[in-house]
């Protein structure tokens, strides 16, 4: 076991699966599947497996999604890496085909397709047209499509393994802001379930739920609140669809207070669904959500950081909810 970054952990898992599955393919544009890590060998999928299996398509997200979907329908395990989530050209394929064909064929069509979409938004100074990309709930609205967003290198490796081995299509959201995050990750393959949330800290005063890019700020806030004497139960959704309702309900039944934190937009953010599900199952609980405002991100880095939820925002909301 060694300290590994988010993307190194993912490519290490993909490399192993491609060695086991001789027809598995990886499709990409712009960003070659190469990763290095201190004390570990460089991973270069294109060099190891050749261009027949690791294909640089050029800048054409629709073609990438279509080729991935077609390969999966032909029985080939396929993964594509789309480096800008805001490029929504593949959306109609995900909406009208990827999520439905397995059901439309009575379950006969296997769909081992994984779509890695990089969440490149919420970056100070990129301005509205290049930062408007924390649109995670777009994909969780699509029936038949699983949507996951790991927040740690350990979960990223385990969940990409589960996604590749799943016969259903999976959207695998990659929070680009976490690219430099590293932690101990096993060298061997392992699976992290695609339908289970993770309880990061246990507590009895307040439940805080986040996912993907919001989790570092959630954990900072949870630690600060602990120093103030507040016992926080911090939950990482990991999966946006299916949502682990049981873990959420069990926590809020104990704390009776729920705060959700999202880097995506306030209206219809993942936290809205979390609150709705808990409210249907827990009586007498109090709720609050914080998220990025429903406004285009400004070009000013200072204003952008002021708008984006951070640990201070989480702490203030938690104090108000508990107090």
Regions from the PLM with identified roles:
Residues 1-169, 173, 178, 306, ...:
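Thiamine diphosphate
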């Amino acid at each position: 076991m060694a300290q590994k970054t988010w993307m190194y952990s993912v490519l290490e898992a993909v490399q192993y699966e491609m060695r086991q599955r001789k027809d598995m393919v990886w499709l990409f544009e712009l960003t070659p599947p190469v990763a290095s890590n201190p004390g570990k060998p460089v991973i270069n999928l294109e060099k190891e497996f050749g261009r027949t299996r690791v294909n640089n398509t050029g800048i054409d997200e629709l073609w990438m999604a279509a080729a991935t979907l077609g390969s999966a329908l032909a029985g080939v395990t396929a993964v594509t890496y789309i480096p800008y989530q805001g490029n929504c050209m593949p959306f109609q394929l995900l909406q009208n085909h990827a999520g439905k064909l397995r059901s439309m064929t009575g379950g006969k069509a296997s769909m081992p397709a994984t779509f890695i979409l990089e969440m490149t938004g919420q970056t100070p100074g990129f301005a509205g047209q290049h930062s408007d990309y924390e649109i995670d709930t777009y994909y969780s609205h699509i029936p038949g499509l699983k949507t996951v967003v790991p927040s740690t290198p350990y979960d990223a490796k385990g969940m990409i393994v589960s996604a590749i081995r799943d016969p259903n299509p999976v959207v695998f959201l990659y929070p680009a802001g976490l690219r430099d995050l590293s932690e101990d990750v096993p060298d061997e393959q392992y699976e992290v379930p695609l339908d289970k949330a993770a309880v990061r800290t246990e507590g009895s005063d307040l439940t805080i739920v986040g996912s993907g890019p919001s989790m570092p700020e959630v954990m900072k806030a949870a630690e600060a609140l602990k120093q103030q004497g507040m016992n926080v139960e911090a939950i990482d959704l990991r999966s946006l669809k299916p949502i682990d309702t049981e873990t959420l309900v069990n926590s809020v039944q104990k704390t009776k207070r729920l705060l959700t934190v999202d880097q995506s937009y306030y209206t219809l953010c993942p936290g809205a669904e979390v609150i709705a599900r808990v409210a249907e199952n827990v009586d007498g609980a109090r709720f609050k959500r914080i998220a990025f405002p429903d406004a285009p991100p400004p070009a000013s880095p200072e204003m952008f950081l002021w708008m984006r939820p951070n640990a201070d925002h989480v702490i203030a909301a938690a104090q108000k909810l508990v107090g």
